[in-house]
């Protein structure tokens, strides 16, 4: 990172960083947040959804002290936004950490406008910004979860007609050769 002064945003992922103990998480955060060139240290974690007890007030306060941490989490259906999950997200928000959600569009799970709208509203009530809805990657063994592009576009249009502003995420695909997230409307 030192050799690349144009890098302003660092993503800590590669699995889930919150499976590590607090001191290890903070070692990474401090290493990046301490660099003057870095504006944002993003933590990508499913912990608020799958292990909300992990996101304690103490951990949130430590993360918030850097002033640079943002959290990207992943919820795929409204039922995952439990009171415990909302409390975990609230701990982060109260510590001054912006929280956003990256959802995966999954056949048979959330592939309807109604399911997506319920999720987006549940996230907003938990003070989490719905940010991206990803087209499921073409990974071996999960083809049955992939939603056809035309269906994804229909869901996006139906959602856009019924919710707006911060409640409407971008529907995108993460293409292997692309240098950015590609809106599904362009595919």
Feature locations, PLM:
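Conserved AdoMet/S-adenosylmethionine-binding subsite of the radical SAM
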Residues: 1-9, 18-163
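Short glycine-rich or small-residue beta-strand-to-loop segments that form or flank ligand, phosphate
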Residues: 11-13
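C-terminal accessory regions of radical SAM enzymes
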Residues: 153-187
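Short, internal active-site loops enriched in acidic
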Residues: 17-18, 48, 176-181
